[in-house]
Design a protein with these regions (language model features):
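Trp- and acidic/polar-enriched beta-sheet ligand-binding modules for extracellular glycan
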Residues: 188-193, 214-296
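Hydrophobic loop/turn residues within beta-sheet-rich immunoglobulin-like superfamily modules
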Residues: 198-201, 257-259
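Short proline/glycine-enriched turn/loop motifs at strand-loop junctions of beta-rich domains
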Residues: 33-34, 44, 202, 226-228, ...
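Contiguous beta-strand segments within globular domains
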Residues: 204-206
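Disordered, acidic Ser/Thr/Pro-rich linker "stalks" and the adjacent N-terminal cap
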Residues: 1-197, 212, 217-223, 294-296
């Protein structure tokens, strides 16, 4: 017998404000959220989750069969969402993933419900290569929901540049800043590193990059953005792949030999630096395509 799919709406002090469950799916419609409110999802290791009507549904992997989602409410956390996403009554859904969906070839990096944990906040102005390139939250078993993105730098620690923005399924060309132009960015540092953790072994064979492309000119005739023309991808088996992105906001596909891995890391990212640009390189979205190795 399988567990029921359950969604709970909890207050800051743990009081249950609302709850819904079902054998295969659950739908809850919380009223206005209060500070500190959170949603708790449980019932399966693979769930299709939608945390708000304005957020894409995605399949997530839950090692312990559940996860808690604090409602984004502070000034930084909401910058990667459309205004009003978590205001007023919202329909929240969860459904059990079917075997065929779990085993399907798909984008394994998609998770609009991803979030930055407190243990992952780093100094945006630290000396080069001094910030950790691995997530201490993942290492400490604190991440409940995968895929999960982590970066060793976030520009000014602003929410519109969080690593989670690169796996939320949204990509808009020609701008930068808050939604809908949110991205992952680490300013103009040369030691930037981004990792997508899958939480279990998967087999991957290509990535699709959506580079940020704010190429509008300022009053000095300079473009805001540049791009990485060399990047080294590292996998948990120790293998590496070198790719060469181009200057475009269109999706760029990079296939490689299939490999089993628990993460994909941008180990090195070399930006093109020219006088006609402010030389900010950033990522709107990364897709990592492959299959799940679990037989569930």
């Amino acid at each position: 017998m399988t567990d029921k799919i359950t969604i709970q709406w909890l207050s800051a002090d743990g009081m249950v404000r609302g709850e819904a469950d079902g054998e295969q799916s659950a739908t809850l419609r919380p009223a206005e959220y209060a500070p500190g409110d959170r949603l708790c999802f449980s019932g399966a290791r693979y769930l299709w989750v939608r945390v708000a009507e304005g957020v894409k549904e995605s399949m997530v992997f839950l090692p312990e069969g559940g996860f808690t989602y604090p409602i984004p409410q502070d000034e930084q956390a909401i910058q990667g969402f459309a205004p009003g996403t978590f205001a007023g009554a919202q329909t929240v859904t969860a459904r059990r993933a079917e075997r065929s969906e779990i085993s399907a070839y798909r984008n394994l990096a998609l998770n609009p419900a991803d979030r930055r944990l407190a243990e992952e906040v780093v100094d945006p102005d630290a000396p080069e290569w001094s910030n950790p390139t691995n997530s201490e939250a993942v290492a400490g078993g604190l991440v409940e929901c995968f895929p999960h993105a982590y970066a060793n730098r976030v520009t000014r620690n602003e929410g519109c540049f969080y690593a989670r923005n690169a796996i939320d399924g949204l990509s808009n060309k020609g701008g930068h800043g808050v939604y809908p132009f949110h991205s992952w960015g680490g300013a103009v540092h040369k030691d930037l590193s981004l990792t997508v953790y899958f939480g279990r072994a998967v087999t991957v064979d290509k990535i699709i990059l959506h580079l940020r492309s704010d190429y509008g000119l300022n009053d000095k005739g300079q473009e805001h953005d540049t791009y990485w023309n060399v990047a080294i991808l590292e996998f948990s088996d120790g293998s590496e792949v070198e790719i060469h992105p181009e200057k475009t906001g269109d999706p760029q596909e990079f296939p490689f030999a299939p490999r089993e891995t628990t993460f994909l890391k941008f180990k090195r990212m070399d930006p093109v630096q020219v006088e006609t640009s402010l030389n900010f390189a950033a990522l709107n979205e990364i897709e990592v395509w492959g299959t799940d190795n679990n037989s569930l």
